[in-house]
Curated annotation (Swiss-Prot):
Protein's recorded name: UvrABC system protein C
SMART domains: GIYc (SM00465)
Residue spans crossing the bilayer: none
Organism: Hydrogenobaculum sp. (strain Y04AAS1)
Principal location class: cytoplasm
Subunit structure: Interacts with UvrB in an incision complex.
Single biological process term from Gene Ontology: SOS response
A single GO molecular function term of this UniProt record: excinuclease ABC activity
Gene: uvrC
Family, similarity comment: Belongs to the UvrC family.
Pfam families: GIY-YIG (PF01541), UVR (PF02151), UvrC_RNaseH_dom (PF08459)
InterPro entries, A to Z: GIY-YIG_endonuc, GIY-YIG_endonuc_sf, GIY-YIG_UvrC_Cho, RuvA_2-like, UVR_dom, UVR_dom_sf, UvrABC_protein_C, UvrC
The UVR domain, residue ranges: 195-230
Residues in GIY-YIG domain copies: 12-89
Length: 565
């Protein structure tokens, strides 16, 4: 019987359904109503390639009826973990991420494990096992917890004792009380809760020193130094909770942010393949089948009651929330989630512009302050990311009044001259912050210098791209385009504003003058006292400078530095 005919015979009850090809599992899913869900697959197959793949690769269809959806969820997780179906590929997290386990023994030690059921206190997870190995090595070197798997009783210690990696509890070379102090210190090191253990260590150091046990005192002193470095480097905490996993779904990426001891310790991106059918709760459920459930799980999408029950079966006191803390949200938006998807950008660009996506984009912005200190900025997008080494700032030389168009023309012309002279590479595209007026200025410069560059402008209020060939493209609903062009526009604006502020800053005077040979402390102070900004200094007449004892060459050197910036 073919699969379509089998679907008609499927039960209208909760359970799990399995697409197979002989012994190979193709896809496993769950449903409140098995037949209804399978009919949905069948219908979507006609429009979606990703659904059709399951049917094309399957020869058999099976199902298992359960009492409710919650039972179906648990069964689905077990089956996926056991059989690793082809089209549940993103759910195959295997044995989970490594953690450092502080063992629950008479003489505890640390070990790296992926088994969340082992007894002891787990710290992590570590997305990079090499980091876990380095930390374990540091713990043995600093706190000298035993290195053996099982602690035998023996008359002489092993080589690790002589190497300073173990305190030798197996040979009674350390008291149980002193070993417990080392364990407490190691735990503080792993958890970051250092301040609670430091007073005990200081007290013990004094006690050992008073009893002339200087070797023991030195051992604890080394621990204090390591732990004090943690205190000094903790900085600002991100969140007021000790332990939370944050999941952020954006486009075809699911991001995981791991917070431990109020700090962001790791993040990871799970890329979602469009050709696969993905249930985000299945993905998270499978992740927690082999990883530690934290005190709190936060997601920017709804988590069903059944999923929550499943997680609570692994940890009763777990809490859930849809509210991502603002400090972390800013980090997500600035550094990770807003990282543009290059392939999506190229696809959207070709679809909307009818031409190949640019690899090298130069984006321009003009900034001034109350009609003065007009500056220009250029930021660069190259091969899928910002290239800050190619950023340029421009101090406007030919315009003494408020005229953004004339200022832009100067900046673009100066840039064009370097391109024509082969000093710099020709970009694929110029993106100008502004509307049709700025676009016209870009086209004018392009035609004057005979440049082979695609000219566009981006109007901020409307979020519309205007192109030299007459297109007007609203980009807000095109995620990848909006990310790249919005990122470039905002970066150019930030870069220009920073330069503008620097020109208006008295502190910037000293910073710049320190780069010029022959300008000593006296001349720096004269310039600093008589000018409010570098802008005022380079605009001053030579006669005034002469009276102050400042040579014209210093002014020219400042101009050169500002021009190079």
């Amino acid at each position: 019987m073919d699969i379509v005919a089998l679907i008609e015979k499927a039960p209208e009850e909760p359970g799990v359904y399995i697409f197979k090809n002989q012994k190979h599992y193709i896809y496993i899913g769950k449903a409140i109503n098995i037949k209804k869900r399978l009919l949905q697959h069948l219908k979507e197959r006609e429009q979606s390639k990703k659904e059709a793949n399951i049917f094309n690769h399957s020869k058999e269809l099976e199902w298992i009826v359960t009492r409710n959806e919650y039972e179906a969820l648990l069964l689905e997780m077990d089956l996926i973990r056991t059989h690793k179906p082809k089209y549940n590929v993103l759910l195959k997290h295997g044995s989970g991420y490594p953690v450092i386990l502080l063992t629950d023994d008479e003489y505890p030690t640390v070990k790296i494990t992926r088994d969340t059921s082992e007894k002891g206190e787990a710290f992590g997870p570590f997305l990079n096992i090499n980091k876990a190995l380095k930390i374990k090595k540091l713990i043995h070197a600093t706190f000298r917890l035993r290195t053996c798997e099982e602690m035998p009783k023996r008359p002489t210690p092993c080589m690790d004792y002589h190497l300073g990696l173990c305190s030798g509890p197996c040979a009674n070379l350390i008291s149980k009380e002193d070993y417990a102090i080392s364990v407490k210190s190691a735990k503080a090191f792993l958890s970051g809760n250092v301040k609670d253990v430091l007073p005990t260590l200081y007290e013990k150091i004094e006690q050992y020193a008073s009893n002339l046990a200087f070797e023991k005192a030195a051992f604890l002193r080394d621990q204090v130094l390591v732990l004090q470095n943690i205190v000094d480097g903790q900085g600002v905490f991100l969140y007021d909770i000790e332990e939370v996993d944050v999941f952020y779904l954006e486009g075809y990426s699911l991001w995981l942010f791991i917070i431990r001891n109020k700090r962001l310790v790791a993040h990871k991106e799970f890329r979602l393949n469009k050709e696969l059918i993905i249930n985000y709760e299945e993905m998270l459920g499978t992740y927690y089948m082999s990883n530690i459930v934290p005190k709190k799980i936060v997601a920017n999408f709804e988590l069903t009651e059944n999923f929550r029950l499943f997680i609570k079966s692994k940890r009763k006191d777990v809490a859930f929330s849809n509210n991502i803390p603002k400090p972390l949200l800013k980090i997500i938006e600035k550094n990770v989630v807003l990282k543009p998807d290059t392939k999506e950008f190229e696809s959207e660009f070709y679809k909307l512009f009818g031409r190949k996506a640019p690899k090298l984009i130069e984006c321009f912005d003009i900034s001034h302050f109350q009609g003065q200190y007009t500056v220009g900025s250029m930021v660069v997008w190259e091969d899928g990311s910002l290239n800050k080494s190619k950023y340029r700032r421009y101090r406007i030389k030919t315009v003494d009044y408020i005229d953004d168009f004339a200022s832009l023309k100067e900046v673009l012309s100066r840039r064009a001259k370097r391109i024509v002279s082969k000093e710099d590479q020709t970009p694929d595209m110029w993106l100008i912050d502004g509307g049709k007026g700025q676009l016209s200025m870009g086209i004018e410069v392009k035609e004057k210098f005979l440049l082979n560059i695609y000219i566009c402008s981006l109007a901020k209020k409307e979020e519309i791209i205007y192109t030299e060939d007459g297109l007007e493209i609203p980009i807000k609903n095109h995620q990848a385009l909006y990310r790249v062009f919005g990122l470039l526009r905002d970066e150019a604006h930030r870069f220009a504003i920073t330069y503008n502020r620097n020109l208006r800053s008295k502190e910037f005077i000293k910073d710049t003058l320190s780069k010029i040979k022959g300008v000593g402390k006296v001349k720096k102070e004269i310039i600093y006292r008589h000018f409010d900004s570098l802008y005022d200094f380079i605009k001053s007449d030579d006669e005034k400078l002469k009276k102050l004892g400042i040579s014209k060459s210093i002014k020219e050197s400042v101009k050169k530095i500002l021009g190079d910036m």
